[in-house]
């Protein structure tokens, strides 16, 4: 059966690019066969997961062309790699926070700070998009329960809210090792509350949280609509505030925009300082990538950093994930990171913006997508079947071209620039609420860029 795999590899080499084949298929080894299943091994989990995700159907087709249509392929990590992983098990952040409530006990009064030591002010890249939030967080860290209590930081996913929140805790502990600091997601706070209610240990729960010097709660929006959790957090907030203890929370929205959040909590969040984090510009993204690459020992060429920053989303976490993937491929294959490698390795999650998109291209593409005429898209007709595509097209023009608001208005039938601004803001606001709209715009964006 090993001959079958070698032949299948040879066939795949003819249809895949050299870069793809040598990176993902060549490292796969024959491990045996059982009945009608071919057993294959990847040298590590990273390659196994990537091959399973992107190339397993192609592998299966190649193997079946040499055997029969009922043949199966099973891909595992090499045994020696599994043993290495087993010796150093790591529980993921998600498991820690979102594990089954039934399996947990109510946490004792003693606590862990839950702080990630890597998230400090030194490792945070400051730019125009996050400068205000950074300054506010640093001020709170240097003077807890001073001017800004509570501190409410809000912004989109992956922009650095958790980093700043954790940096505050780490800075406070650097100055005072005896400070009672605790970082919790609102989900974990709720899970612990549920368990303490179940085991009738509410006094222990209250003693734990109401005796903190600094309470850091991430993603507070998740307690919205949870009456008992909001009730308990409200009293915890009051107890800490009245004791002149610092409270810092993060959210993906401004307090007034969180649906299901009680008015009494909303008003308390507005007592202190509210700071927002905006998506980073290209220069800031390049700086973030460079700092992360230096920290992780990854040699990242300037042209690749610029390619990632120009082509990727504004989600910093996603940006760093791409860098980690590139670093892993370079390390596992013994090759240097190049622009060609970046395009190949990240082609499933990145779009290349080197092709210039024009307003006219967007109008034609959106009109075709919604099966309407370009003239209707540019008209003043207020039919819903035309208004929504028109607003989407205007939003994409602002997002993908360098055209100014007046320029866009001129190309949409001479509309006033204030109308164009309204359309952009309207779509921008709806994107956080309407997942169908978000999916449509993402599909159109990728189609235009590809």
Curated annotation (Swiss-Prot):
Binding site for ATP: 158, 160-162
Pfam families, per database record: Bac_DnaA, Bac_DnaA_C, DnaA_N
SMART domains: AAA, Bac_DnaA_C
Gene3D superfamilies reported in the protein's UniProt record: 1.10.1750.10, 1.10.8.60, 3.30.300.180, P-loop containing nucleotide triphosphate hydrolases
Region (Domain II): 71-113
Localization per Swiss-Prot or TrEMBL: Cytoplasm
Region called Disordered, residue ranges: 82-103
Annotated region (Domain III, AAA+ region), positions in chain: 114-330
Keyword tags: ATP-binding, Cytoplasm, DNA replication, DNA-binding, Lipid-binding, Nucleotide-binding
Source taxon at top rank: Bacteria
GO MF annotation list: ATP binding; ATP hydrolysis activity; DNA replication origin binding; lipid binding
Keyword check for tRNA-binding: no
Spans annotated as Domain I, interacts with DnaA modulators: 1-71
GO CC annotation, single: plasma membrane
Residue ranges, annotated region (Domain IV, binds dsDNA): 331-450
A GO BP annotation: DNA replication initiation
Complexes and interactors: Oligomerizes as a right-handed, spiral filament on DNA at oriC.
Function as written in the Swiss-Prot or TrEMBL entry: Plays an essential role in the initiation and regulation of chromosomal replication. ATP-DnaA binds to the origin of replication (oriC) to initiate formation of the DNA replication initiation complex once per cell cycle. Binds the DnaA box (a 9 base pair repeat at the origin) and separates the double-stranded (ds)DNA. Forms a right-handed helical filament on oriC DNA; dsDNA binds to the exterior of the filament while single-stranded (ss)DNA is stabiized in the filament's interior.
HAMAP family, A to Z: DnaA_bact
UniProt similarity note: Belongs to the DnaA family.
Domain notes from UniProt: Domain I is involved in oligomerization and binding regulators, domain II is flexibile and of varying length in different bacteria, domain III forms the AAA+ region, while domain IV binds dsDNA.
Protein name: Chromosomal replication initiator protein DnaA
Organism the protein comes from: Geobacter metallireducens (strain ATCC 53774 / DSM 7210 / GS-15)
Gene name, Swiss-Prot/TrEMBL: dnaA
